[in-house]
């Protein structure tokens, strides 16, 4: 966007944290210590976003254990931050999960910056907004996931559910998920994880 518009800009590369810096963070937040026993999770925690989301998960009751894998980490974050399993009133975890996935899916399918908030249960939207999982644009009355990583995870969840539903007919599976740019990216991530876990 910037180059074709002849806007002057400079690129700034920001490195992740070092292993020593991650260890220092874990000294201050001992609940994270179990995560650094796994090399792949140490690499993950070099990205400050993952430390922040892990701390949010811990605040919601998550317990990370020595030996947790990247899949365990992701499942724990999904259960405690996105679904927020601790708040079970009115079936809220399932509603939160379904709404978050649907927001990401619709945004990807329609290739829009935001989706009209009026299409979703206002109570669920308010809860996701309170937890800083979605952003509301007051001017356009639209919502979108707040974090790219969580949006990718939501799209992978959508793809996984369609795969389970259509595993007997892979052509229909591929037609159902579509090939929009965000879906294609999420499909590559989903397929990589599938192959990595030999599932």
What are these regions (language model features)?
Residues 48-49, 161-199:
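Leucine-rich, amphipathic alpha-helical/linker segments
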Residues 42-56:
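The conserved phosphate-sensing helix
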Residues 33, 58-125, 137-144, 148, ...:
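Winged-helix-like regulatory helical subdomains adjacent to P-loop NTPase cores
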Residues 132:
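Glycine-centered, phosphate/nucleic-acid-interacting loop/turn motifs that mediate DNA/RNA or nucleotide
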Residues 36-46, 89-98, 146, 177-182:
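Structural motif
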Residues 56, 60, 105, 156, ...:
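Positions within ordered alpha-helical repeat solenoids
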